[in-house]
Amino acid sequence: EWCGSNADCGDGQCCTGGSFNRHCQSLADDGTPCQKPNDYNEYKFGCPCKEGLICSPINYCQKK
């Protein structure tokens, strides 16, 4: 589903992608690729991790 910002997506999702190809995607799960949370809530490659997980230095979710 196309989105302009995270507000266009449901709970547990973020808006990710390039400027013309943005879509809602589920928050990243343990062991899956992620993008670290940022102040602007702008994500190009993936979503932040689900609650209780952190995005590791190699951009994969893992338990805290």
UniProtKB/Swiss-Prot annotation:
Cellular component per GO, a single term: extracellular region
Keyword Secreted recorded: yes
Residue runs in coiled coils: none
Tissue note: Expressed by the venom gland.
Localization terms from the record: Secreted
Disulfide bonds: 3-15, 9-24, 14-47, 34-55, 49-61
Annotated keywords: Disulfide bond, Secreted
Role according to the record: Non-toxic to mice and insects.
Family per record: Belongs to the u-CNTX family.
Name of protein: U9-ctenitoxin-Pr1a
Gene source species: Phoneutria reidyi
